[in-house]
Amino acid sequence: LEGVCETVRDLYAERAVCYFRLKKELSKYGVRILRADELTPRQKEEARTVFMTHVLPLLSLMVLDAKHPLMQFENMKNYMLYDLERDGRHMVGVMAFNAALDRLYRIGGGEKARLVPLEELVRAFGHNAFTGYTAGGRMMMRVTRNADFDTNIDDSDVERDFSEIMKKKVESRARLNVVRLEIDREDEKLKEFVLKL
């Protein structure tokens, strides 16, 4: 496992280098992928409108507290977590991303394309969905769940319907143990919460 972790760490670093190289190359052709903090005030207002009208209606929200302490996080699905406070009580706000949402949203017109990733819109404006709460830290997360595949499948089973066997195995993954947790930044309260998964 240590070898896997070391290799994965290197692959994540390589992925980041590729992403920034691609971003730089795209900007030469007038396509810019922007973080929310890079937007002008006018662009930020347009991005907020895009979030409120096109993104927010497709997000699933939940507030976890002492009465509702945990939920089942789906395999390979993105979530934004918020450290929420109301009347001196701390809670965790969970915003689940819908697969129907676009991954990039164009802001502004003209020949040059300014694109804001879905994750940036949620990070910048998602706290508005939790009315009545004060939002503190926020953290994007995704879990990978274990998949137990039996290599001793009888040949007659495979001949009958291999796709059905695989479908059942993949579906069972939704209930299995978390083997990887990905977060985009460390917020101590939220990190403490997700480590209980």
Short names for language-model regions:
Residues 1-197:
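N-terminal non-catalytic structural scaffold regions of very large proteins
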